[in-house]
A protein has these predicted regions:
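Structured beta-strand/loop patches that form or line metal/cofactor-binding pockets in enzymes
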Residues: 2-51, 57, 329-334
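Metal- or metallocofactor-binding catalytic centers and their adjacent structured scaffolds
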Residues: 6, 45-110
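Conserved, mostly hydrophobic/aromatic
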Residues: 49, 95, 108, 158, ...
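Shared catalytic-loop signature of beta/alpha-barrel
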Residues: 80, 207, 213, 224-243, ...
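Glycine-rich, aromatic-flanked loop segments that form ligand/cofactor-binding clefts
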Residues: 96-136
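Metal-dependent enolase-superfamily TIM-barrel catalytic cores that perform enediolate-based chemistry
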Residues: 120-238
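Extended hydrophobic packing segments that form well-structured cores
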Residues: 352-369
C-alpha cells in the first residue's frame, strides 16, 4: 500500500470569549469582565481523502499557515521526520497532533492505539484559576471551600494557582488552610509558576507544603524554572516533591533537569512538543523510574495519557467556583474540559473514536471565525 502524501492544508482562525476572567499579571476571576481568546483549526488532507484535524490551539493562525510548505507534498506518516526538522518551532506540535489524528483515522483506531494503549480512562485534578482580590478564590478559606467542593464532586487532586502578588504569608496560609480542610482526602498541589522573587520565599512555601502534606510544588520562583542548582538545593531542604519543566523549551532540556536531580516530576507538554515529543520525554523519564505530568486539558493530552504508564493525572485547567470552563465549546461528542468533565469517581474517559476521537462543532467554529 503506498504511503499517502499531504495534499491540502487548511488553517482557520476563530475566537471565543470567557465571561468572568481578566488578566493582570495572571488570569483570574473578575465579575463583569470578559476576555476574548484567539486560536484556530488545522485540517490536513492526504491524497487518499483522509483528513487529520486539530482545533482549539492558541497560536497565530498566520504562523501556522506559514509552516504549511514544510508539509505539503510530503508523506503523511513521517511524523518523526517532521518533529526532528522543526522541534524548536512553536507550531510544530499543532501539525504533529493533526497528523496523529490522520494516522488514527487511516487505521480506524484511536491515536493511543497507535502509540500502544495502557488505559482508557484517567484520573483528573482540578487546576484553579489564580486567586483574586475579592470574590471566590480570594482568601485561604475560599480556596479551602473550593477544594472541598471539588472533593465532593469526585476529584482526586486539587491544584492551587495562587495569587498574582508575592506576599508569601498569604500563599503559606492558603497552603495550610487547604491542607487542613482536605489533606489526606485528595492529592494537593500548588503552582506559583515562577512567582516568588527569592529562594527564601520558595523555601517558606515548600515548608508549608511539607506541613500540609502536598503532593507537589511546581515552578516556585522567578528563575523561570531553569536553574538546576537552586532546585536541587530546594529539594534537599523540603520533603514535598518538585515538578519542573513547563518553562524550559525542549524535551532535551526537561530531561536534563531530571538528570541534574533538579525535579521529582517532569512536566510534559503535548501542546508544545506534540504527541511525538511528549512520548519521548515520558519514555526517557520511565527509564530512570520517574513520572511525567502532562500540561493542560484537551483531546491530545487524553490520547497521550492513555498510552503512558508513568503519569498520574489529567489537568482540568483554569477552573473556578463560578467560571467552570475556560476552553472553547468545540467538542460535539465528548465532555473533556471544564470542571464538570469528570465522573463521580474523578475519572475522565479517553475518546475512543478514530484519531483524537473528536467530532468538532464546526457550526460554532465557523460562527466565530
Amino acid at each position: 500500500m503506498p504511503v499517502p502524501t499531504i495534499q491540502k492544508i487548511e488553517v482557520q482562525g476563530f475566537t471565543w470569549s470567557v465571561a468572568g476572567i481578566t488578566h493582570r499579571r495572571a488570569f483570574h476571576y473578575d465579575t463583569g469582565s470578559s476576555l476574548t481568546f484567539s486560536g484556530g483549526t488545522l485540517r490536513v488532507t492526504a491524497d487518499n481523502g483522509v483528513v487529520g484535524e486539530f482545533a482549539g490551539w492558541r497560536h497565530d493562525p498566520k504562523a501556522v499557515a506559514g509552516a504549511a510548505a514544510r508539509y505539503l507534498g510530503q508523506p503523511a506518516l513521517d511524523r518523526e521526520r517532521f518533529y526532528q526538522q522543526a522541534k524548536r518551532s512553536g507550531v510544530m506540535a499543532i501539525y504533529d497532533i493533526a497528523l496523529w489524528d490522520l494516522a488514527g483515522k487511516m487505521a480506524d483506531v484511536p491515536a493511543h492505539a497507535l502509540m500502544g494503549t495502557y488505559r482508557t480512562e484517567v484520573p483528573a485534578y482540578a487546576s484553579t484559576i489564580d486567586g483574586a482580590v475579592g470574590g471566590p478564590l480570594s482568601t485561604p478559606e475560599s480556596f479551602a471551600d473550593f477544594a472541598e467542593a471539588c472533593r465532593d464532586m469526585g476529584y482526586q487532586g486539587f491544584k492551587i494557582h495562587p495569587y498574582a502578588w508575592t506576599d508569601v504569608r498569604q500563599h503559606v496560609a492558603t497552603v495550610l488552610a487547604v491542607g487542613e480542610r482536605v489533606g489526606g482526602e485528595m492529592d494537593l498541589m500548588i503552582d506559583p509558576y515562577c512567582l516568588f522573587d527569592t529562594f527564601a520565599d520558595a523555601l517558606k512555601v515548600g515548608r508549608a507544603c511539607d506541613e500540609a502534606g502536598f503532593f507537589w510544588l511546581e515552578d516556585p520562583y522567578s528563575d523561570g524554572g531553569i536553574t538546576p542548582f537552586s532546585h536541587t538545593k530546594l529539594r534537599e531542604m523540603i520533603r514535598t516533591p518538585l515538578l519542573q519543566g513547563e518553562q524550559v523549551s525542549t524535551v532535551e532540556e526537561r530531561m536534563a533537569l531530571i538528570l541534574a536531580k533538579a525535579t521529582d516530576f517532569a512536566r510534559a507538554d503535548v501542546g508544545r512538543h506534540g504527541l511525538t515529543g511528549a512520548l519521548k520525554l515520558a519514555h526517557a523519564a520511565e527509564t530512570v523510574g520517574l513520572d511525567i505530568e502532562p500540561h493542560r486539558s484537551g483531546p491530545a493530552e487524553l490520547q497521550f495519557l492513555a498510552a503512558v504508564k508513568n503519569a498520574n493525572y489529567y489537568e482540568v485547567v483554569w477552573v473556578h467556583p463560578v467560571m467552570r470552563d475556560s476552553e472553547p465549546p468545540i467538542y460535539a461528542n465528548v465532555s473533556i474540559t471544564g470542571l464538570d468533565c469528570i465522573d463521580d469517581r474523578g475519572m475522565v474517559q479517553v475518546p475512543e473514536g478514530p484519531g483524537l476521537g473528536i467530532i468538532y462543532d464546526w457550526d460554532y467554529i465557523n460562527a466565530h471565525a
